[in-house]
Amino acid sequence: MAVNHFRFAIASDLHIALPHTVWEHPSRFHLVEYSIEAFEVVLAHLCTLELDFLLIPGDLTQHGEPENHQWLAHRLAQLPFPAYVIPGNHDLPTPAHFAPFLQFYRDYGYGWNQQPYYSLHPLPGIRLIGLNSNFFTPTGEQIGYLDQAQMDWLSQELPKSKDLTLVMIHHNLIEHMPGQGSNPLGQRYMLENRTPVCELLHQAGVQLLFTGHLHVQDIAYSDRFQMYEITTGSTVSFPHPYRLLEYRDRTLSITSHRVEQIPSLANLSEFSRTWMGDRAHAFIAKLLMAPPLGLSREETNVLLPDLRYFWADLAAGDAQFNFVHFPEPARSFLEAFSDRPPADNQVILDLS
């Protein structure tokens, strides 16, 4: 008999890094040195709840280090509920990393599959499809793309069941900010062949996508494909979020939580927001100078001081920006990043 009520959690972009593997770089954005402590805080909370499963939508490790995969696989084995994972771009830095990845996570979705995607039923009447969005071009460039073999598999798999289907994929399929699919800075977070993938999912009645990669708390809806994409921020960058979700009678209730302190850093939230603000200026400058805004360096430098926490506020979700003192067109461009419905952190989605 199909389950009509279940609870699950999402923790994304863990970037697990054991101390001896931490990559030191002066402009490093991710607080990977706190990855294990932050994840342990998440798990301590989740283990007090009656969850049916946990989803981790990619970037499980810092840079695909075997010892970091081993640590995570061992830790997931200790949980009182199943966990299901997919690879992110950081987990598969080269094509040679695919086979070991499947070995590490056989118990977390892949079983004895020879391919990095799967379909399973975590509960009666609930289907979970885990996809691999990492693709290497002939020149070795890593992009977000579903290859033809996976597209063929997906087109055959989707019609096999009319069960409620959850799809987990690392790259975004629906835009979470203005022009994400066309802006050079936003494109790399999106699946290149997202339109045919969305068409396949829509034809099968899929309404729920769970993604990561962007390190932003956002829920986007596509009118064209009648589909929600729930992307969850990273546990190693502000605001260190994770989500609890409860499905009941064709509604999905979503609540979001934050890791605000860890044993080694009582003021993690404040420290992390400052860390991000100190390192965001180069990214924000590129955003302002790139098309479609195309500001000059001089114009950009005037605006940057007031945009120190722009990305942190965006990452937190539900942001509402007001730059009334900015000249046009910069004001309209930046205010367009204000959140649009549905809400990003606490919301009930109607799936009827």
Where are the predicted features?
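Beta-strand-turn-beta hairpins that frame and shape the catalytic cleft
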Residues: 1-9, 119-130, 160-164, 222-229, ...
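N-terminal active-site segment of His-dependent metallophosphoesterases
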Residues: 1-70
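Acidic/histidine-rich helix-loop elements
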Residues: 12-37, 93-111, 137-146, 181-186, ...
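Divalent metal-coordination and catalytic microenvironments
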Residues: 13, 54, 59, 72, ...
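Active-site environment of divalent metal-dependent phosphoester hydrolases
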Residues: 17-20, 62-67, 89-96, 136-139, ...
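His/acidic metal-ligating clusters that form di-metal
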Residues: 44-53, 127, 141-228, 290-291, ...
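Extended active-site neighborhood of metal-dependent phosphoesterases/phosphodiesterases
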Residues: 66, 70-155, 159, 188, ...
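Binuclear metal-dependent phosphoesterase catalytic core
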Residues: 226-302, 335-352
